[in-house]
Amino acid sequence: MSSRLGAVPATSGPTTFKQQRSTRIVGAKNSRTQCSIKDNSFQYTIPHDDSLSGSSSASSCEPVSDFPASFRKSTYWMKMRRIKPAATSHVEGSGGVSAKGKRKPRQEEDEDYREFPQKKHKLYGRKQRPKTQPNPKSQARRIRKEPPVYAAGSLEEQWYLEIVDKGSVSCPTCQAVGRKTIEGLKKHMENCKQEMFTCHHCGKQLRSLAGMKYHVMANHNSLPILKAGDEIDEPSERERLRTVLKRLGKLRCMRESCSSSFTSIMGYLYHVRKCGKGAAELEKMTLKCHHCGKPYRSKAGLAYHLRSEHGPISFFPESGQPECLKEMNLESKSGGRVQRRSAKIAVYHLQELASAELAKEWPKRKVLQDLVPDDRKLKYTRPGLPTFSQEVLHKWKTDIKKYHRIQCPNQGCEAVYSSVSGLKAHLGSCTLGNFVAGKYKCLLCQKEFVSESGVKYHINSVHAEDWFVVNPTTTKSFEKLMKIKQRQQEEEKRRQQHRSRRSLRRRQQPGIELPETELSLRVGKDQRRNNEELVVSASCKEPEQEPVPAQFQKVKPPKTNHKRGRK
């Protein structure tokens, strides 16, 4: 004992404790020394080693008598250093090793954990986990299935290799059905060639007529419907394509090298005509303008070119129209959407106006868009509107933001509006204010309206056929015509005023002249009466004649044979 650990001096106090500590570290390094504590005092136990000592009677070293018996360590300090307090147990027989310094087994630790769960958690750093029972299902799922084994060179092995390579295997009987598993393929082969319906395009077998129709519609939609004489029935074909598009949502090109799909019938048909064709064939299919020879790929492009560059296409009669335009008209009537009754009536009126009047008077560069009337061509007068200062407008806008409404500023008017534009329109027709703007007046029937939208609606609904004046004396511009009409009305008013003044003067002339003989007075009165009758008859006949412009008209006084002052 003294040869391995060294002699411990028989001194008391702190020096003895340091020596004991150093010897304990040396024993830990050799990993053959175990430390045990008995009655809160240190005791060293050295395992039996035959190579070092020949005696077998020394199973444990003697206790150190010099270590003070009163020196004790706390239980918490010993537990922090994983030093278990020694228990009263007898040392085993010769050659046995004392188990006092060994770690407790798992069962004893669990018992200590039940007594001190928090300290156990702090000392050993073990977390409390709930006891879980193993799930038999999860264990069963984890079992990996072994790949099926088939005989070498059998059909099952060939099918399995094809499924691994391509993902599916086709039926060897019909070559139209594919399956992803060998079991599914065998199940199909039991009923193969027993279905009632077979596709005559690809040979696929189906169990029901509805399934066959859907298969043909979805996979063979490019095949046209033929008549008795092998002619394509366009209405039936369009109806079939419309049904396919409604159910599937798209039409796909059936060429193997093309994967295009379309959401409209026109786009699909346009693609089918040109898909897979060479440049020479596409060049033959182009449409050329008969005026300038410019080529176009579509009829819509050619129609736009003719409208914008070579005048309106509707001015041509049916016999004089080019073949391309006739085809366009027939296509728009036969296929596509059905026109409404109002649209047909409008087209009829436009064509009638264009063919009858506009082709004669308008320039050749006019287009069909000029047939649509705009504000300048509307036959109504606009009244003047009052002007407002910026301060007033700013005040109105502020009131709208605060109170969300504006009241009419005129006294006695309780009109309320939620916008500045509405208040402006109201002030133009409000009779309680200083400004009276007037009303909108239709020049065709002299009817008055409060708002501009009202007079526009009136003209569009009542005078729909009177957009353009159909009169041989009309000019090319509607504005010039309106100016001439205004001038004629002013001249007519001037004539009436002039006639009324002349009649008043003639009536006042006998009172101003000097008294004459009775004979001369009678003759003068008779002549005046005759002259007045002539003037009245002439005034009655004048409105029946066409009005003559003022610049070509000369006012001539009526000729009379009576001379003043002559007997």
Curated annotation (Swiss-Prot):
Residues 1-32, 86-148, 486-567 are annotated as: Disordered. It holds the Pfam family ZNF512_C2HC. Coiled coil: none annotated. The keyword Zinc-finger applies. It comes from the Eukaryota. Residues 119-130, 495-508, 556-567 have a biased composition (Basic residues). GO terms for cellular component: nucleus. Residues 12-23 have a biased composition (Polar residues). Keywords: DNA-binding, Isopeptide bond, Metal-binding, Nucleus, Repeat, Transcription, Transcription regulation, Ubl conjugation, Zinc, Zinc-finger. It is found in: Nucleus. The keyword Ribonucleoprotein does not apply. There is a cross-link at residues 18, 84, 227, 333 (Glycyl lysine isopeptide (Lys-Gly) (interchain with G-Cter in SUMO2)). GO terms for molecular function: DNA binding; DNA-binding transcription factor activity; zinc ion binding. Belongs to the krueppel C2H2-type zinc-finger protein family. May be involved in transcriptional regulation. This is Zinc finger protein 512. The gene is ZNF512.
